């Protein structure tokens, strides 16, 4: 089904698609409550679906059952007025009126509307404290993520992780990793050996909705990298990452 005022979860297809995007436009700012209510009313008239606000201004969400797993759901994210959507389970983004996929440049520019709302300190930092030039949607239980992150660690690469999993069974462990005293080291152990930390205390402030929304904006495929110049790559090779980060360093581009 296409997205013509109808929304459907599409199963994830292949990885390894490399896309380049343009400079960000139309940066989003915080939405007052009245604006959120008006946006939601507009979307509910368009789609006859129940929408809720997300942690990102101007971006709203519905949940749909995952095909062949009716007790699990995946978020579908829709911009105000229904112009564009991110369908978690489908790589990339779509036009809201036709369901046609956005080009790489359109998708990336759409993500970067919210670059100022990304809580960078809440991401899992790896490779020191230098300029941040790459964000990586990664899953500690994903073989592709494990292989890539091992190579990045060996090279001393500086990047920040949006933590995720490849299924729902391991999602309860994400707060344990994030709330551990050293989340960077805990993540490395989890992805490298499968070792998990003790359960997080009830005071843990892990923001599940925030991370799931951010994951959905990246398309849901793990690993996916977003570079500070707007290049977005699914399943990037270590060689590409090294070359891209060197270019960004020479050009002085960072988040």
Residue ranges and their predicted role:
Residues 1-12:
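Bacterial N-terminal signal peptides that target proteins for export
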Residues 4, 22-27:
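Serine/threonine-rich, low-complexity intrinsically disordered segments
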Residues 10-20:
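Bacterial N-terminal signal peptides
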Residues 16-18, 26-136, 141-172, 189-222, ...:
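Extracytoplasmic thiol/disulfide redox context detector
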Residues 173-190:
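Acidic, Ser/Thr-rich peripheral helices and adjacent loops at domain boundaries
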């Amino acid at each position: 089904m296409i997205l013509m005022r109808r929304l459907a979860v599409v199963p994830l297809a292949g990885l390894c698609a490399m896309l380049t995007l343009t400079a960000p436009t139309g940066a989003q700012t915080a939405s007052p409550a009245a604006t959120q209510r008006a946006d939601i009313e507009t979307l509910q008239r368009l789609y006859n679906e129940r929408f809720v606000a997300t942690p990102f201004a101007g971006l709203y969400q519905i949940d749909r059952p995952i095909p062949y797993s009716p007790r699990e759901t995946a978020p579908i994210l829709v911009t105000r007025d229904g112009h564009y959507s991110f369908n978690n389970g489908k790589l990339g983004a779509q036009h809201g009126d036709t369901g046609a996929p956005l080009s790489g440049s359109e998708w990336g520019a759409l993500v970067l509307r919210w670059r100022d709302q990304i809580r960078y300190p809440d991401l899992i930092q790896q490779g020191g404290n230098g300029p941040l030039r790459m964000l990586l949607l990664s899953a500690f239980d994903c073989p592709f993520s494990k292989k890539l992150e091992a190579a990045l660690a060996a090279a001393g690469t500086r990047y920040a992780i949006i933590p995720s999993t490849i299924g729902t069974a391991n999602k309860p462990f994400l707060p344990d990793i994030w709330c551990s005293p050293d989340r960077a080291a805990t993540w490395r152990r989890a992805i490298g050996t499968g070792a998990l930390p003790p359960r997080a205390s009830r005071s843990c402030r892990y923001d599940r909705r925030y991370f799931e929304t951010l994951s959905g904006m990246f398309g849901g495929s793990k690993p996916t990298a977003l570079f500070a110049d707007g290049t977005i790559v699914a399943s990037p090779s270590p060689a590409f990452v090294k070359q891209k980060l060197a270019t960004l360093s020479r050009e002085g581009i960072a988040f």
